């Protein structure tokens, strides 16, 4: 085919059935804009391809065929939106602008031209005349400047019902449109649309229902893509029982969890188990829906190594009858693919290494290309053998990917920017979890992520204790380093036992963070302020700060932060004895755990539910919660299981008065102080005061105070059930762990009862009585609700020694009942208040004594 030299003054006419497509002389257009376009020549020029559509009798047509013309205009708008074009509308004129930075802009313009051709053919009876002109303008040209450019055609006699293009547009479109020179008319005639490739037969043995394990992905990613490409219909779900359906959708949260953490180098076992359970159930339903379907083959790349082979073999766990095969070799001629189309193909190939199959349409929508554009692209990729499986971006052989990469090397920064910007959007939506692996992915794509993302990752990785000793030299001179330095200083001030100073520093730190809008660091600081106020028994203030932390977690859409904030709110309400609100937030926590699959919070959530039930005298319910927590911990968090067993045994002992738990308590009392506490308490409740040699261990207060910055972290081993609640407040205020304090009180009470009626032991009796009263007095002074129990035990001893009328006896009982009354102040429901005062074992004894002494 002979083409006239570039820059010649030429025009062309294309006869396509009833339409005409002409190439106009370059001289017809405004030289003002042309000068901008002429400054850059060849394939590297910055351009914007535009399509100008005019309906000469638009207003008359809107009166004669209002519905048809409105439908035609709506279609044009849809063409623009679906192909990533900016559409400018002015009376009878429509201008489609395909910006230079938009990937595949020429291919998108050709799709738009084809759609316009077919649509105007459909509306032939209504629209007799129209003019369509294609030209190239400067990429930064304004809509007014573009419209002025196209108005120049009015001085040229152009046939009605015509498609026209400038010489520059022809140079861009020549890979998609066939042009024949007409020397006599000094024009180009376009015969039609070029085919990119000859139709090739479907590769033998290849099926669309296949699992492709790429060299850069895991078997879990391959299974996710297969399930996304072949979703189960609603009809399949309708055959499930309500219980199975609920279980299936519960497990689906594991898939979402995996997708959020897709770049992590390792995954917890509970995720792997739930994921495989979900996939196993999926395949069961998949085969039930298509009983005669063959097991989907598992494909690996022709050049796949040993690791890819191992990943592919793991798929056999859920699909054991699937054959393991290699993808057929590709015969793709990458050089024959138009440059801009190759760029789009490579973009999809590279993006498929970072996103899943059900995110591809979303990705192209982010690039302003709709589903039909993606469908056409997949068709082109398959017919050119870029992909070996129809509509599957994961079946692109590695050598084809590498060839495409060499072809589009110049455009690589733009392509990386498109993918990383989409991933950044996913991160902001909460669909990607902040982690060092995510940061590494952004670095790989050369994306400049924000400082808040780095902080978000650090606060995910490290607890406050770890951050206090974190080496931050690598962040020196950055916003991250400045924030970490301020936050570290706050923590270190707190560790020097100056609570007020730590609070002031935290408030100053918060002001700095809010000014810079570092939401993740703001979340952590609000949590720190909440713990500082909890440590001072300011529960109302703590609820405010934890509430702000919850708002930040919701803004970040971070499941782990959300669960943490909900748990902190629940334990604050628990410490306040507002059990209704505590249960409400534990219920919200349970929902968040299910939604985000943050299973590491499940054990402590169940444990605190058990503690609330225990406080209200619901011993059977408490036992069920502790047993469920222990069973789950045994599977995935073995270090948490013994403590749950200890508390379950305690609840069982309270519920059925069984003493079978004694052996468990004795085995574990050396490692778990709660076991020793419950062992002593069980003897006291059973009135077994016959062995003075028992319980000679009296844990005293620690010699050095704990740091005044209280905190709770799942990363720290938990040896006491009080450490996530009471120890944060009263255990720190008196430097006496709550479990040790309780066991000491019960041990002193036990020995008071043992030596009470032994004249030779009265000195020992008074020693234990004084110790018991000293601990009770201090608990009363600091507002510890346990003072009600301690003072009741003091009352019981005084009653047995001095009688009910003695002043000391009455004083102990009065103070004990006053503490209990103060404890029910936040219980708004009468039933809850009654449960707490009359169903709880020790509270019921105190309540009965108060009634007997006319205090109620």
Curated annotation (Swiss-Prot):
TPR repeats lie at residues 107-140, 523-556, 603-636. Keywords: Repeat, TPR repeat. InterPro entries: TPR-like_helical_dom_sf (IPR011990). It comes from Treponema pallidum (strain Nichols). This is TPR repeat-containing protein TP_0123. It comes from the Bacteria.
